[in-house]
């Protein structure tokens, strides 16, 4: 770094070398400000999409689910079917399935 500075001082003089250094720092400053503006714009964009698209979309989906499929799933008859008529020995068991009759408290094979 000092070698480069000494070479610039010899070839261009102290005024131009100082001017080049100042212009270099000014360029770095402007690059930083441009990057800051870009990050701020990206942050505002993400905040906009999150506030106006993601949250309302999730709330809308939850609302629709709650008042359509959610109501249907909270049906006691459906729960009785799922609990009582599903094979008690799992999906992949080779043995015959065991079913339970809820009204008569009997097991069927």
UniProtKB/Swiss-Prot annotation:
Residues 33-109 are intravirion. Residues 90-101 have a biased composition (Polar residues). The chain crosses the membrane at residues 12-32. Residues 89-109 are annotated as: Disordered. Homooligomer. Interacts with the M membrane protein in the budding compartment of the host cell, which is located between endoplasmic reticulum and the Golgi complex. The cytoplasmic tails of both proteins are important for this function. Interacts with Nucleoprotein. Belongs to the gammacoronaviruses E protein family. This is Envelope small membrane protein. The gene is E.
């Amino acid at each position: 770094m000092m070698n480069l500075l000494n070479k610039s001082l010899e070839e261009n003089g102290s005024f131009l070398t100082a001017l080049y250094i100042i212009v270099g720092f000014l360029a770095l400053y402007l690059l930083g400000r441009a990057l800051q503006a870009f990050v701020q714009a990206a942050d505002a964009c993400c905040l906009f999409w999150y506030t106006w698209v993601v949250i309302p979309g999730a709330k809308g989906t939850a609302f629709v689910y709650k008042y359509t499929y959610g109501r249907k799933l909270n049906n006691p008859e459906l729960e009785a079917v799922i609990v009582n008529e599903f094979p008690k020995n799992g999906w992949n068991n080779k043995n015959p399935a065991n079913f339970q009759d809820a009204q008569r408290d009997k097991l069927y094979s």
